[in-house]
A protein has these predicted regions:
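Conserved AMP-binding/adenylate-forming core of the ANL superfamily
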Residues: 90, 107-161, 178-183
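Glycine-rich phosphate/diphosphate-binding loops that line cofactor/substrate pockets in enzymes
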Residues: 98-100, 135-140, 184-192
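Structural core segment of the AMP-binding/adenylate-forming
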Residues: 165-230
Length: 230
């Protein structure tokens, strides 16, 4: 009992220490300059909220077909915004930034055991296009489901954007799940393609992702192709 008590005291002290956070992470000047919404926006939105959001949507999003209807509130609480517009998420995340910000870093990645990457919009665009073209060559079409079973690597971002680019539906499966759990999710989604890796670092160990996928294939009949990151 005494040992448990001491351990409990230690754990309580550790929890309290974690609750006290004194570090500061100041935002960049660029972020500060662009973070706050001007007061004129509030005035504009209060006068005509639908017109305000129409303006924001048309100026801040790239459309293949601009919407003519702002809000469909005919079936509350199932509201639909810009329902007759057409766009592509991957295009808005990547293509629209290339001309002015192609060399700008889209995101920083740090993995185990300490490797890092700085991925620009141009780099990400090229990777996404390469994978989306590969998916199309494998017969993946709009509406098809793709299971993504990866570690926390840049390829998981590439995979999601590549699916969005061709209209495929991606289903991200946690890389720590077993073959059985992965198979359950493949079957639920009826995924015809799986994107995985030969392995992934997690808490100092390498998770055998590809081996887990191989095990899941024995429990599903939907998968036609497996793409492996090495």
């Amino acid at each position: 009992i005494y040992i448990l008590f001491l351990r409990g005291e230690f754990m309580n002290e550790k929890i309290e220490n974690l609750l006290k956070e004194d570090r500061k992470f100041p935002p960049s000047e660029h972020l500060i300059k662009n973070a706050n919404a001007p007061s004129s926006w509030y005035d504009e939105a209060s006068k005509d909220r639908l017109k305000f959001w129409q303006k924001q949507a048309l100026t801040r999003i790239s459309w293949f077909k601009e919407p003519t209807e702002i809000l469909d509130d005919s079936n509350p609480p199932f509201f639909k915004w810009f329902k007759d517009g057409e766009l592509n998420l991957s295009y808005n995340c990547l293509d629209r930034h290339l001309e002015s910000d192609g060399d700008r870093v889209a995101f920083y990645w740090e993995g185990e055991p300490g490797d890092t990457q700085e991925i620009t919009y141009q780099d990400l665009y090229e990777r996404v296009c390469k994978l989306s073209n590969a998916l199309k060559k494998l017969g993946v079409e709009k509406g098809d489901r793709v299971a993504i079973y990866l570690g926390m690597t840049p390829e998981i971002v590439v995979s999601m954007l590549a699916c969005a680019r061709i209209g495929a539906v991606h289903s991200v499966v946690f890389g720590g799940f077993s073959s059985e759990a992965l198979a359950d999710r493949i079957n639920d989604a009826k995924a015809k393609t799986v994107i995985t890796a030969d392995g992934a670092w997690r808490r100092g160990d390498i998770v055998p992702l590809k081996n887990n996928v191989d095990g899941s294939l024995e429990l599903t009949e939907y998968v036609e192709n497996v793409i492996v990151v090495k």
